[in-house]
Amino acid sequence: MAREVLDSRGNPTVEAEVHTSSGISGRAIAPSGASTGSAEAFELRDTADARYDGRGVRQAVANVDSKIAPALKGYETSDQRGIDQRLIELDGSRDKRNLGGNAILAVSLASARAAAATRRVPLYRHLHELYQQLDSSAPPPRVPLPMVNMISGGLHAGGNLDFQDFLIQPIGAESYADGLEWIVRIYRRLGTLLSGAGYEGRLVGDEGGYGPRLKSNVEAVEFLIRAIEAANLRPGRDVTIALDVASTHFFDGRNYRLIATGEQRLSSDEMIEVMADLVDRFPIKSIEDPLAEDDWRGWKRLTSRLGKRTRLVGDDLFATNVERLQRGIRDHAANSILIKLNQIGTLSETLQTVFVARQAGYGYVVSARSGETEDTTIADLAVATAAEHIKIGSVVRSERLAKYNRLLRIAEEIERPS
């Protein structure tokens, strides 16, 4: 069964429940993105309905109840691949637009939760065993390094910054809990610094990062450096910086149009120079979507230029899609992939993408979306696949903290002496 619930932006989304004959159930909620790539699974919404300004999901919910539920009756929840394959076949489209990627994903994840509950094991252990079916050499579960949003721009905030997220990574922390304390300390120092400089130090974007109207993208990075130092930590040694440029959303098909410092139209090569200059000047160790999703030639040149110095993460470029990832591997485009469950639409396809990335030596970052809920599945997924990083958002807003707190509990379990 399914129902319409609300996400962190007040938009409807799909919650699904899977019930077994033994009385066990699993529940999951599909997230939703603001900054979306063209290759993502289709999010089915009631666009012709005035409810929620055309963003309702009653049709997706109806598809779960009237089409998906009867088709899955009799399946064992332990048969994740069989369930997901049936969902894909039932939809019949390339991008899951018939049933809705949001409907399909909610059912896929709820099935996994029901299976874990049936086995009486934590979700991350169940997901790890599913992943081991693909990758017999999979590393054991581990808690990933958080990649945390400090300043928001682009489509995640109402300011003038072109880049979408300015983030930090507590690389020098001895434990996940210590790293989380560093992050909170830096976040608070950043708010004080912004207020002291006459900027808004309380307004936050969709993912909890501050949303000030700064003079430039570079100034945002400079504020991060100052906040790290104000927290008595060392930039580049204790804490590094990451960027989510989300450049697809200011690419007009020919040029990258930047507005933070006045109207600029940059070619692909000029955009590469902007990225190279930032990496030269600051301890930036990860850049997500520095070029547009179909600028394959530019990505190849950028990877040749910076790939040995920093993680170049494909989000819109790959859309958690194996076919796009395989093209990137062939073309030597990027060296990491962002993993978002709702980009591809089923758990099995997500695990397959992680497997292909790992086999090719690509890094992978498990990520939330801007429209999130109390669902914590991505925390378990990141641990299960031994992801290098997890990108949840900032350390405010309860839909983000639910996932950070889930990781604290998992860390206790993993680190507890046997």
Each language-model region and where it sits:
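Short beta-strand elements
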Residues: 14-22, 29-32, 148-170, 226, ...
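Mobile "lid/hinge" segments at catalytic clefts and subdomain interfaces of large enzymes
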Residues: 132-133, 141-205
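Metal- or metallocofactor-binding catalytic centers and their adjacent structured scaffolds
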Residues: 31-121, 130, 180, 209
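Catalytic core of soluble alpha/beta enzymes
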Residues: 200-201, 218-418
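Active-site-proximal beta-alpha loop/turn segments in soluble metabolic enzymes
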Residues: 165-176, 201-217, 249-261
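Short, Gly/Pro- and small/polar-rich lid/capping loops
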Residues: 1-13
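Glycine/serine-rich anion-binding loops at beta->alpha junctions
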Residues: 6-9, 92-111, 146-158, 204-205
